[in-house]
């Protein structure tokens, strides 16, 4: 009887181990596939950026507050925020569910129409590489912090496109989530 039991254990144990291992591998594979499917097809795979031209129509149809994300070319902090904070799944969900998001180059030389006013850049960086000037829309909406302007800057507008608050500099993920939750109401 002992020999039979020993033989049974010796021959079935490898199958149990292989079977368990395959289940773990299959489970990991399924989770990876599921994450890929969600990422590629989901409303929450990235922030749904819109153009400034679309905002008035969108707000009339479905009123929400607006987030303007001002960046500039060559800004390492802007890049870091785009690659960390703005790809966080919770941040994406908070933004997509509660705000309209618009990304703007704060030093663009293009004219921007906003609330019936055309804003320009009086001294674009292309004309004078040493210029620290920013677009007039940026200057209109961004509050100076300690006497200066910082990149990136996040601006929150109400449903009438009036300034609620501007937040200078990079916003780390936990800080940005709190900011979004505080101004959702």
Protein language model regions, located:
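Short active-site neighborhood of thiol/selenol oxidoreductases, capturing the structured segment around
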Residues: 61-76
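C-terminal motif of bacterial Sec signal peptides marking the signal peptidase cleavage site
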Residues: 17-19
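C-type cytochrome heme c attachment motif
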Residues: 73-80, 153-155
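A short acidic/small-residue loop/turn micro-motif
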Residues: 170-172
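Thioredoxin-like thiol-disulfide oxidoreductase module
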Residues: 89-91, 96-153, 157-163, 182-183
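N-terminal "domain-start" segment that seeds a small globular fold
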Residues: 25-57
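Sec-dependent N-terminal signal peptides
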Residues: 4-14
């Amino acid at each position: 009887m002992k020999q039979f039991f020993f033989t049974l254990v010796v021959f079935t144990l490898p199958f149990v181990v292989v079977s368990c291992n395959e289940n773990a591998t299959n489970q990991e594979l399924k989770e990876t596939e599921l994450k890929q499917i969600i990422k590629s097809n989901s409303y929450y795979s990235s922030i749904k950026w819109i153009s400034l031209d679309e905002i008035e129509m969108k707000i009339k149809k479905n009123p929400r507050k607006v987030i303007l994300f001002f960046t500039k070319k060559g800004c390492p902090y802007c890049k870091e925020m785009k690659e960390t904070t703005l790809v966080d799944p919770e941040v994406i969900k908070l933004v997509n569910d509660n705000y309209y998001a618009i990304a703007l180059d704060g030093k663009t030389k293009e004219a921007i129409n906003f609330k019936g006013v055309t804003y320009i850049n009086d001294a674009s960086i292309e004309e004078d590489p040493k210029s620290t000037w920013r677009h007039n829309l940026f200057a209109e909406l961004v509050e100076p912090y300690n006497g200066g302007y910082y990149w990136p800057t996040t601006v929150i507008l109400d449903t009438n496109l009036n300034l609620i608050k501007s937040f200078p500099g990079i916003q780390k993920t936990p800080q940005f989530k709190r900011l979004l939750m505080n101004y959702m109401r």
